[in-house]
Amino acid sequence: MSIGVLVFPGSNCDRDVQWATEGCLGMPTRRIWHEETDLSGLDAVVLPGGFSYGDYLRCGAIARFAPALQALLGFAAQGGRVLGICNGFQVLTELGLLPGALTRNRDLHFICEDAPLQVVSSRTPWLEHYGTDKALTLPIAHGEGRYQCSDDTLKQLQDADAIALRYQANPNGSVADIAGITNDSGNVLGLMPHPERACDPATGGTDGRVLLQGLLS
C-alpha cells in the first residue's frame, strides 16, 4: 500500500500526515508537489491541512487549478482512495469531488480543540473499522469549517448514506452537525477534524489511527 500526500504552497500538515502514515502505520508514503501529475503506483492520496496558496480568494479556490488536482480527478474516477483533511476537504469541495462548501465558523473565530464525533456511515473504507454509531474524539483547528449545502444536496447526502461523521456538540454551525462526507462511491472522504493528530498516545489519543488504517483495507 503506497500513499501520496499532496503538498501545496501553504500546506502545514503534510509532514504530520506522513509521520502518521509512515511513522506510525508503516505505510510507504510519497510527498507530491502541487505541480506534479504522476500519481502512478499510489493506492491512496491525502490532501492535508494548512492554507493552500495562502487561502486567498477563498479556502481551496486557487488549489483546485493545480496540475496535481487535475490528475487527482482521474485518479478518483478510477476508484482511487482520496482523503481530504481540513484544508484538503475545502479543496475537494472546490474541485467538485465533494458537494457543498466550507465557510466561516458561526462565531467567526478560529477553533482549536478536541471535538467529540459520531460515525454516521461506515460504508466507506476509511470508516468501516469503526462501525456505525461509534463515538470518537479528534482534534479540530479551523476558521472556515462550517459545512454548508442546499436542502436538496443535504437530502442527496442523506439518501446516499454519504454523511460520514457528525459533531456531537456542533462547534462551528455546520448544517446537520456535519463533520465529514463521502462521495457516492465512498472512495473520497473529506473531513474537518485531523485524524493524523490522533495516532499516538504521546500526542493526544489514537482515535484517528483506525481511520488512517482504512488505507490498508
Curated annotation (Swiss-Prot):
Record-annotated active site: C86 (nucleophile), H194, E196
UniProt name for this protein: Phosphoribosylformylglycinamidine synthase subunit PurQ
Organism: Parasynechococcus marenigrum (strain WH8102)
PROSITE patterns from the UniProt entry: GATASE_TYPE_1
Domain Glutamine amidotransferase type-1, residue spans: 2-217
Record's subunit section: Part of the FGAM synthase complex composed of 1 PurL, 1 PurQ and 2 PurS subunits.
Keywords, in A-Z order: ATP-binding, Cytoplasm, Glutamine amidotransferase, Hydrolase, Ligase, Nucleotide-binding, Purine biosynthesis
The UniProt record lists the keyword Repeat: no
Function field: Part of the phosphoribosylformylglycinamidine synthase complex involved in the purines biosynthetic pathway. Catalyzes the ATP-dependent conversion of formylglycinamide ribonucleotide (FGAR) and glutamine to yield formylglycinamidine ribonucleotide (FGAM) and glutamate. The FGAM synthase complex is composed of three subunits. PurQ produces an ammonia molecule by converting glutamine to glutamate. PurL transfers the ammonia molecule to FGAR to form FGAM in an ATP-dependent manner.
Subcellular location: Cytoplasm
MF (Gene Ontology): ATP binding; glutaminase activity; phosphoribosylformylglycinamidine synthase activity
Protein EC: 6.3.5.3, 3.5.1.2
Gene Ontology biological process terms in this record: 'de novo' IMP biosynthetic process
N-terminal signal peptide: none
Family annotation (InterPro entries): Class_I_gatase-like (IPR029062), PRibForGlyAmidine_synth_PurQ (IPR010075)
SMART domains: GATase_5
Catalytic activity from the UniProt record: N(2)-formyl-N(1)-(5-phospho-beta-D-ribosyl)glycinamide + L-glutamine + ATP + H2O = 2-formamido-N(1)-(5-O-phospho-beta-D-ribosyl)acetamidine + L-glutamate + ADP + phosphate + H(+); L-glutamine + H2O = L-glutamate + NH4(+)
Main location: cytoplasm
Gene Ontology annotations for the cellular component aspect, listed alphabetically: cytoplasm
UniProt pathway: Purine metabolism; IMP biosynthesis via de novo pathway; 5-amino-1-(5-phospho-D-ribosyl)imidazole from N(2)-formyl-N(1)-(5-phospho-D-ribosyl)glycinamide: step 1/2
